[in-house]
Design a protein with these regions (language model features):
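Compact nucleic-acid interaction/catalytic patches
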Residues: 23-24, 34-72
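C-terminal terminal-subdomain/extension
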Residues: 63-165
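Short, low-complexity, polar/charged sequence segments that are solvent-exposed and flexible
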Residues: 14-18, 49-51, 60-63, 98-101
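Extracellular structured ligand-interaction cores
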Residues: 25-27, 76
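Short N-terminal edge-element motif at the start of the domain
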Residues: 1-25
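Short beta-strand-centered aromatic/proline hotspots
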Residues: 28-32
């Protein structure tokens, strides 16, 4: 979580895990893609009522299960650079000792993972196109760039972290 806070210090578009706004327990869960030979984590978000009226765009995708029920979204605009040192696997297996809430969360994560696996090529393509727009031609689509993380700036934070170890 320290890495996420380091990123958030240099870019307000990074999804917060700050204790000041009661987000310290929010997991940063996402799908890892490779853009420009760099690993990026595209954050997943749980379904919210506002997502029903939102349309898929260059920086946003809704995920639906086989019954066409909204199961979550991918926020490409909030993707962050990662390396193996900041990635942790998630135990998505349902255990008897899991609470009802944990079981529901793991079921949701499994549904989201199924959707992501079924749409992996489109996810990677969308992430890389967005990366290229924001990192290489930010003036081309200013409104889009404004709501996205500054990928190049965040890459410097990751590089600094790597060099300090």
């Amino acid at each position: 979580m320290k890495y996420i806070r380091d990123l958030a210090r240099v870019d307000d578009n990074v999804m917060s895990v700050s204790p000041q706004i009661r987000k310290e327990n929010r997991p940063f869960v996402g799908i890892v893609v490779i853009c420009d030979n760099k690993k990026y984590c595209v954050p997943l978000t749980s379904p919210k009522p506002k997502h029903m009226s939102m349309k898929n765009d260059k920086d946003f995708s809704r995920m639906f299960d086989k019954d066409n029920k909204l199961i979550g979204c991918l926020n490409f605009n909030n993707m962050i650079p990662v390396d193996d040192s900041v990635l942790l696997p998630i135990d998505m297996e349902v255990h008897k000792s899991d609470s009802i809430g944990e079981q529901a969360y793991k079921a949701l994560l499994n549904d989201q993972l199924d959707w992501c696996n079924d749409n992996l090529e489109a996810i990677t393509s969308k992430a890389c196109k967005l990366y290229k727009i924001v990192a290489e031609t930010p003036d081309k689509m200013k409104n889009l760039t404004r709501r996205c993380c500054d990928f190049k700036n965040l890459e410097q934070v990751l590089e600094k972290r790597k060099n300090s170890k």
